[in-house]
Amino acid sequence: MVELNFEKSVDGLLPAVVQDYVSGEVLMLAYINKLSWEKTLETGQAHYWSRSRNSLWLKGESSGNVQVIHDILVDCDSDTVVFKVDQIGDAACHTGHRSCFFRRVHQGELVVEGKPLFDPAQVYGSK
């Protein structure tokens, strides 16, 4: 198995940049630990470590918007990865947008681009 340098991070978490494998669009940034890395390699589906829940997270386990791994790039220090994925279900972001990067800075202000592809309240329930 490919070993990453989890010891380099104080909390054992490494960044994972997630891109659409066809278009190259950046879909999200998430974090992985050793367990989520192993699960990703074992299953071929993106697994992350949820910092808010402090638990393993299979992308799409609640929404159905799973990420199938097509390619993985590892940086020169083995402490950051790029997951090139097939985004099943169109939306990668928990807000319902295709990408978590749906806001652009324009003249010092945040401007929302595009509309959500699903209603998060219907998928995840009210908080």
From Swiss-Prot:
It holds the Pfam family PRA-CH. Pathway: Amino-acid biosynthesis; L-histidine biosynthesis; L-histidine from 5-phospho-alpha-D-ribose 1-diphosphate: step 3/9. It catalyses: 1-(5-phospho-beta-D-ribosyl)-5'-AMP + H2O = 1-(5-phospho-beta-D-ribosyl)-5-[(5-phospho-beta-D-ribosylamino)methylideneamino]imidazole-4-carboxamide. Transmembrane segments: none annotated. The keyword Transferase does not apply. One of its GO terms (molecular function) is magnesium ion binding. GO terms for biological process: L-histidine biosynthetic process. Its EC number is 3.5.4.19. Mg(2+) binds at D75, D77, D79. Binds 1 Mg(2+) ion per subunit. Binds 1 zinc ion per subunit. It comes from the Bacteria. Belongs to the PRA-CH family. This is Phosphoribosyl-AMP cyclohydrolase. The lineage of its organism: Bacteria, Pseudomonadati, Thermodesulfobacteriota, Desulfobulbia, Desulfobulbales. The gene is hisI.
